[in-house]
Amino acid sequence: MDARLLEILVCPICKGPLHYDRAAQELICNADKLAYPIRDGIPVMLVDEARQTVEGTPVDPAGPAGS
């Protein structure tokens, strides 16, 4: 995932930052607890395509899958 693209993409709901989960190929919004898929290297930023993340388990942007 291109670092420049990650800098400009935001959650379509809250406009908050997204964190790249390399292993799952998803962009995560911790505020809304949503994960947006990345398909063939293209982020799918449609709310209908997002999945709910596990409640109470925020993605750590500094972790192994962090941006």
Curated annotation (Swiss-Prot):
Transmembrane segments: none annotated. SUPFAM superfamilies: Trm112p-like. InterPro entries: Trm112-like (IPR005651). GO terms for cellular component: cytosol. Pfam families: Trm112p. PANTHER family: PROTEIN PREY, MITOCHONDRIAL, ZGC:162634. Belongs to the UPF0434 family. This is UPF0434 protein Bcep1808_2639. It comes from Burkholderia vietnamiensis (strain G4 / LMG 22486). The lineage of its organism: Bacteria, Pseudomonadati, Pseudomonadota, Betaproteobacteria, Burkholderiales.
